[in-house]
């Protein structure tokens, strides 16, 4: 089972793959905010050509291949909040560019957040938001088919406007994710984000089982059940002071066994960035890789 981590752009765009390989990783999740957001390298999206995208991301794939490194999945630039853009047309244009780049990077999976409606928290606006997300995702199908890429929908969270804590929203529940994939068709898979599941009190192990053969990729990270910390596995401990309820804690052994149950063949991807100040980055990445290697030994099957 390959282990991967979020790409870093360090020590440079071209050298990042060799750096992460030297830290112990086999591949990465390549994030596109640096490229296709409004302030990105290709931020002027209406004037970016297919040839520019092909040239740049083919170059990066070749740099990765030189050191035996792979892009296991990508993450599009869209946060899920349409008000940050002029129109849905602009959002779709940027997401199509991410799909093209995914193809040229040599990956099959691009994680794309759903559209959020303004009040989609708990069970509010469930149908309205589901339908809006379906309409958005359907517009990506031509690009997904043309470039042979699968869109992975991710379980999300929102904030309670009164109490300020994290709560469930669109696609927080695995059953809703499966339902959406069934509506959208074979070009859509599921990305189980472990940390997000903990925050919405959805057991990531059970989410994997419900996703079944629709599970396309993973975002593995830990937290205290309160904040989206994107912490190393095993790091958050104990119950925060003053809390009357016990946050959901991650059972990593059970999680790896759940991957066996559904015959998951993808990579174990840590959605984690560089830890701390630059002088300790390499040690931090090496520690992350050691954790990831340990977790892979908990599986019964070898992939």
Predicted features, each with a name:
Residues 29, 73, 111, 152, ...:
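Conserved beta-strand positions in the central sheet of alpha/beta enzyme cores
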Residues 138-142:
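Histidine/acidic residue-rich metal-binding segments in metalloenzymes
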Residues 148-152, 191:
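Conserved Rossmann-fold SDR core element
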Residues 9-11, 32-34, 77-80, 116-118, ...:
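Active-site-proximal loop/turn and secondary-structure-junction residues that shape catalytic pockets
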Residues 26-135, 146, 252, 260, ...:
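Structural motif corresponding to the early beta-alpha repeats
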Residues 37-51, 122, 161-170, 241-244, ...:
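Short, flexible/disordered intra-domain loops and linkers
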């Amino acid at each position: 089972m390959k282990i991967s981590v979020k790409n870093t752009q360090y020590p440079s765009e071209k050298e990042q793959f060799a750096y992460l390989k030297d830290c112990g990783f086999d591949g990465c999740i390549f994030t596109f905010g640096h490229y296709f957001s409004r302030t990105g390298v290709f931020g002027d999206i209406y004037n970016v050509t297919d040839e520019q995208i092909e040239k740049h991301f083919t170059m990066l794939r070749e740099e990765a291949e030189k050191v035996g490194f792979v892009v296991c999945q990508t993450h599009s630039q869209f946060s899920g909040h349409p008000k940050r853009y002029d129109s849905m047309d602009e959002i779709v244009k940027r997401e199509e560019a991410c799909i093209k780049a995914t193809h040229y990077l040599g990956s099959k999976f691009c994680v794309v957040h759903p559209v959020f409606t303004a009040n989609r928290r708990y069970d509010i606006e469930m149908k309205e938001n589901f339908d809006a997300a379906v309409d958005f995702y359907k517009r990506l199908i031509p690009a997904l088919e043309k470039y042979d890429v699968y869109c992975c929908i991710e379980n999300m969270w929102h904030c309670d406007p009164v109490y300020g804590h994290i709560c469930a929203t669109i696609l927080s529940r695995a059953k809703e994710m499966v339902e959406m994939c069934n509506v959208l068709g074979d070009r859509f898979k599921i990305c189980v984000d472990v940390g997000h599941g903990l925050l919405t009190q959805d057991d990531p192990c059970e989410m994997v089982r419900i996703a079944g053969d629709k599970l396309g990729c993973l975002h593995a990270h830990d937290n205290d059940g309160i904040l989206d910390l994107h912490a190393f596995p095993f790091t958050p401990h104990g119950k925060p002071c003053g809390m009357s309820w016990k946050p959901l804690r991650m059972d990593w052994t059970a999680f790896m066994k759940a991957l066996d149950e559904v015959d998951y063949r993808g990579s174990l991807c840590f959605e984690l960035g560089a830890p701390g100040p630059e002088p300790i980055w390499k040690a931090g990445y090496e520690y992350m890789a050691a954790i990831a290697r340990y977790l892979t030994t908990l599986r019964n099957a070898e992939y």
